[in-house]
Every structure is written in C-alpha cells, then in structure tokens.
C-alpha cells in the first residue's frame, strides 16, 4: 500500500487528507508546523495559522473573473458535502448549521451590475434564492451554511488522528523537495521523513511552498481583522449578512455556532472586517481597525448592540493572514523532473475562501492523484 504526504494542516490540508481516506486505500503522512487540537479550546492563537480564526460561511458570487467559474464549482461541491455532514453527523461535533444568508450591494459598487443582473455563477444551484427589495441597491437572500472554525478543524483532526492509516509529523520544511527525497537539505525543525521520502506529495501550504524553497510569487497575504461579539438574542442569530458599500468596503456578521460557553443555543457572532492586501505589518489587532468595523456596524447592524448599554460587547479581536493568489486557488499536478515517478499536487492560495472552497478543491486534487496512482 502506498504512502502519500500532505504538507499543511489548515482547512485545505485536513480536507485533502479526509478525502484521501474516503476515496483511496493509501496511508497518509501529514507534515505541519502547526496542528489543530482535538479540543477547540486548546488552540493557541497565531495569525499565521489562519484557519481557526476564519468567519467560515458561504456566500455565492457572480463570475466576474475567469477563475471565478472554477471557484463557483468548488464552492458548490463543498456546499453539497456540508449538507451531507449536517444530515448525518451530530452538530455538536461538526458545528455546521444551515440558515439564511443575505447580500446587500449598494448602487455604485464596482460589481453592482454583476449582482443586480444575476450574472452566471451567482444563483445557480443555490437553495431558496430570492431577490429582495432594498432602497439602496441590490439585495438577495438564500440558504447557506455557517460553522465554528475551531470546532470543525478539531472534528476533522480527531477523525484523522484516530485512523490507523494516518501519521502526524510535526516540523517545518524549507523546500517542498524535502518531502520527496532523503538527500534534500534539512533544517533543525525538519521532521523524520523516513528512508526515501514520498512519491506523492500534496502541497497545502497556504502561500505555496516551492520545490526549491520560497513561496509562489503569485501568492500574497490579505490581512483580515474581525471581532468576536456577544450579542442579544433575536432573529439575527438565524442569519448571516454581508454588506458591500459603493466604495467597495465589506461589512458582515456571521453567527459562530457553539461559541458561547454560557449558552449552547445563543451564539457569539463574528463581525468584520478588513481586507488589507499585502499587509504583513502586524499580527496583532489594530485599535483603529476595530473602531472602523464597529462604526460601520453601528450604522448597518445596530441590532447586535447590547440593549442595556447601547454598546457592542466585544469578546476579542482576531487577526489572520489569508493566503491569497493571483489567478485564484491553485489546483494542479506537477511532475517532479529529477525524482523518478514523483508528483506534487498543489492545493493552495484560497485567500479568505478556505472553508468555502475546501472540499471542492480537495476532491478535485485527489482526482488528479488518482489519475496517476491508478495507472
């Protein structure tokens, strides 16, 4: 039985490993500098391990760019997979919840016409899609999903860790080549890769670790800052809303299931956010960013404020560096030129859409592997 290697344990790495378990009989080694924990409460905060701090919801989008259509296909596949998980797995384990999503796009927004004219990719395969009246522009609602990112990572991680076909190796690779051959240069943090390395390696490293080191030059970070809020009970806990201003600014809130330790039925809410491209300056929250988010929310979502104090109850701010890529997520097979019968399967650069794309890109990249493995 072959052994394959998955490099990276964010949402894409765990989704790929989960798909490999489901669709193949191979053994799997997962190499990562950071791993989730079996308990979501044990996660240590790091802006560079972005997956635990995501808002994690799905919103459809019209096909504006060439790579949007690929993303549409991946998001629909993920949507279908999450529907199955919600139907057959306990919510207290996956945290997945289906509810109403709403888009609000102001007139004058750069992509207003793509939404208002319902361009390709927006409403296809979306349940309960309805166009609403809204005096300031375009509005639509639809059935969507939300989840608690730390819970869901822990759910996947526990299933992988308990499977005898899966081995976890904590360490850091300087080059992707290290995973293929014992002769590659190692560093002090390199994990033990065995005698010969691996012939099949899935590159789920966010910014795209390259064969000879460094990152994919098409990749860049988007600094995202959000706020975790305690909010009053009400119908707002049964929906997620995304507002896009005419200036192109995004403001959203997303219920985070099972997040309130005081009440399993009253969720905290993720309020966001910032999209600061190529901003690697600070992994710490910025007070001005928090103030800007709260100022917009005060106008757009006053129902989230505490009724007694008239203020937002901020539990904590979160910062994550979303690994993005020009041209969209990379889902591609690469023959390693100087290592016999060896292939890299690239799966990285999802930006702020890691959860939305997760199982769609995972199934796609595993299919690429099966084309080689079954020959």
UniProtKB/Swiss-Prot annotation:
Its cofactor is FAD. It holds the Pfam family DAO. Residues 1-17 form the signal peptide. InterPro entries: DAO (IPR023209), FAD-dep_OxRdtase (IPR006076). It comes from Komagataella phaffii (strain GS115 / ATCC 20864). PANTHER family: D-AMINO ACID OXIDASE, FAD DEPENDENT OXIDOREDUCTASE SUPERFAMILY (AFU_ORTHOLOGUE AFUA_5G13940). It catalyses: D-aspartate + O2 + H2O = oxaloacetate + H2O2 + NH4(+); D-glutamate + O2 + H2O = H2O2 + 2-oxoglutarate + NH4(+). Disruption phenotype: Unable to utilize D-aspartate as a source of nitrogen. This is D-aspartate oxidase. Glycans are attached at residue 203. It comes from the Eukaryota. SUPFAM superfamilies: FAD-linked reductases, C-terminal domain (SSF54373), Nucleotide-binding domain (SSF51971).
